Amino acid sequence: MKTFHTVAELRTALKIERLKDKKIVFVPTMGNLHDGHMSLIRKAKEEGDIIVSSIFVNPMQFSDQSDLERYPKTLEEDKRVLEANGCNYLFAPDALEMYPDGKRSQTQIEVVGISDILCGASRPGHFVGVSTVVTKLFNIVQPDTAIFGNKDFQQLKVIQDMVRDLSSNVRIIGVDTARNEDGLAMSSRNGYLTEEERRIAPTIYQTLLWAKEALLENRASHEDICEQAQQKLEAAGFRRDYFEIRAQENLQTPSEEEKRLVILTAAYLGKARLIDNLRVEL
C-alpha cells in the first residue's frame, strides 16, 4: 500500500491506474479504524480493482473544538490494518492540504432539506462540513464507486442526495452496520465509554429492536413509540438527543401510507454520543 499526503501525488498515481482501465473504489474515513471500517474495505474489493481509502479528521464537521481535539488519531496502526486488508492507496492529508486558505474561506456545500434535521439539528453545520469534504475528496480521487456505512444513515442520505443534485457520476453503496456480539454498533466513539458505560451501551440497539417490533405490531402511534423508547434509554442511563421514526426515502416525517421507514436515534452516554438506526419495511 502506498500512502500519499498531497493531492498532486495521489492524482498522479491514480491517473496511471485509470490509463490501465482500472475501476477505482473509494472508502473515506476519519481513522481510528475498527472492524466496521474493514467491512467497507471488503465490500470495496468486491466492487473494483483499486481500493483507495482516506484518513482525514475533518475540522469542518466539528462544531466543538474539544471534540475535534480528542478524536483518536492512530495513523500508523490504521496504515497497518488497511494494508493487511488489501487497500492499495491511502490518502492522509493534513488540514492545510485540504483547506489551504483555511476552513472559513472554503466554499461550502449544503444539501438542503436534510442537513439541518436529526443529527444536523443538534450539531449545526456538521453536514455542511461532511458534504464539503466528501465533494473535495470525490474531486481528488475521482472514484467510480464510494462505500459508506449504514450506521450513519443520515450521512449516507446526505451524500446520496448530494451526488444526485450535483450530477456526480460516483456510484454510492451503503454497507450494513457492523455490530459487536452484544449488538452495539461498532464506532470509534465507543472508545470514550467507561467499562460500566460499555456494559450499558447495547441498550441503544435493544431499544431500536423494541421500537421496530412495536411498529410492526402497530402497538402505538409513532410519537408514543418514540417517547417510550426515550424513557427506556433514560432509565438505562442515557441522556436523550433524539429518537425518531422517519421515511427512508427523505428522512421526513412519514405519511400514514409510508411503508419504508427507518428508526434513528442519538443519545449521550457519559462523554460519548452514540448513534444507531434500524430500517423497517411494513
Curated annotation (Swiss-Prot):
<dbReference type="GO" id="GO:0004592">
    <property type="term" value="F:pantoate-beta-alanine ligase activity"/>
</dbReference>
<dbReference type="GO" id="GO:0005829">
    <property type="term" value="C:cytosol"/>
</dbReference>
<feature type="binding site">
    <location>
        <begin position="186"/>
        <end position="189"/>
    </location>
    <ligand>
        <name>ATP</name>
    </ligand>
</feature>
<protein>
    <recommendedName>
        <fullName>Pantothenate synthetase</fullName>
        <ecNumber>6.3.2.1</ecNumber>
    </recommendedName>
</protein>
<dbReference type="GO" id="GO:0015940">
    <property type="term" value="P:pantothenate biosynthetic process"/>
</dbReference>
<dbReference type="GO" id="GO:0005524">
    <property type="term" value="F:ATP binding"/>
</dbReference>
<keyword id="KW-0963">Cytoplasm</keyword>
<feature type="binding site">
    <location>
        <position position="178"/>
    </location>
    <ligand>
        <name>ATP</name>
    </ligand>
</feature>
<dbReference type="InterPro" id="IPR042176">
    <property type="entry name" value="Pantoate_ligase_C"/>
</dbReference>
<feature type="binding site">
    <location>
        <position position="155"/>
    </location>
    <ligand>
        <name>(R)-pantoate</name>
    </ligand>
</feature>
<dbReference type="InterPro" id="IPR014729">
    <property type="entry name" value="Rossmann-like_a/b/a_fold"/>
</dbReference>
<feature type="active site" description="Proton donor">
    <location>
        <position position="37"/>
    </location>
</feature>
<feature type="binding site">
    <location>
        <begin position="149"/>
        <end position="152"/>
    </location>
    <ligand>
        <name>ATP</name>
    </ligand>
</feature>
<comment type="pathway">
    <text>Cofactor biosynthesis; (R)-pantothenate biosynthesis; (R)-pantothenate from (R)-pantoate and beta-alanine: step 1/1.</text>
</comment>
<comment type="function">
    <text>Catalyzes the condensation of pantoate with beta-alanine in an ATP-dependent reaction via a pantoyl-adenylate intermediate.</text>
</comment>
<keyword id="KW-0436">Ligase</keyword>
<feature type="binding site">
    <location>
        <position position="61"/>
    </location>
    <ligand>
        <name>beta-alanine</name>
    </ligand>
</feature>
<feature type="binding site">
    <location>
        <position position="61"/>
    </location>
    <ligand>
        <name>(R)-pantoate</name>
    </ligand>
</feature>
<dbReference type="InterPro" id="IPR004821">
    <property type="entry name" value="Cyt_trans-like"/>
</dbReference>
<comment type="subunit">
    <text>Homodimer.</text>
</comment>
<dbReference type="InterPro" id="IPR003721">
    <property type="entry name" value="Pantoate_ligase"/>
</dbReference>
<keyword id="KW-0566">Pantothenate biosynthesis</keyword>
<dbReference type="Pfam" id="PF02569">
    <property type="entry name" value="Pantoate_ligase"/>
</dbReference>
<comment type="similarity">
    <text>Belongs to the pantothenate synthetase family.</text>
</comment>
<keyword id="KW-0067">ATP-binding</keyword>
<feature type="binding site">
    <location>
        <begin position="30"/>
        <end position="37"/>
    </location>
    <ligand>
        <name>ATP</name>
    </ligand>
</feature>
<keyword id="KW-0547">Nucleotide-binding</keyword>
